[in-house]
Amino acid sequence: MSSALIVGDLQAGILDNYPFTKAVVPPVTELLPRARAAGVLVVFVRTAFRANGADLAGEVFAAFHRQGDLFHEGAPGTEVALEVTADDVVVLKRRTSAFAGTDLDLVLRARGVDSLALTGVATSAMVAATFYDASDRGYGLTVLRDGCADQDPAVHEFFVDKIFPSRGAEILTCAEWPAPSRTRGARTAPR
């Protein structure tokens, strides 16, 4: 039984162009070495689309793609903005959820991970979509309140105060996680 820390969409282009995202950088940056020292698998998830748009589905993704290189695969804006170590995993996604069309579940299962702590932006998008996918797959879930943000703070608060707890998630701050129980094995969601 082990845990993974999911760090979603904290990439250069997003941090540079969406001011609300900057608030999560200090607590997540402080958390990373503690999580690694506790034996937690750190997984960075980034978003990028093919330059020719072959992987676009729907207007939301097309709108991101039209922003130019900001979301084009291989562009500097799609690179993880925080320090990535050799033991970390980086997953490329082309949809909102970190699980949709990626090998994230395969990596987590191969490492014996049964519990996830979620951070990233935006709370109502990447974090929520990944949360629902992870819950459906039977992972125990913790959402790190100050490690997530949304353009509308009220939406963020609604998710972390109402939605995520109603689905069985533990809500903590980055400073409170990983608790000792998380490194030895965390509770899992009902399967």
Regions found by a protein language model. Name each.
Residues A35-A54:
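Von Willebrand factor
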Residues A12-D16:
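Short acidic, Gly/Ser-rich segments with clustered Asp/Glu that frequently serve as metal-coordination loops
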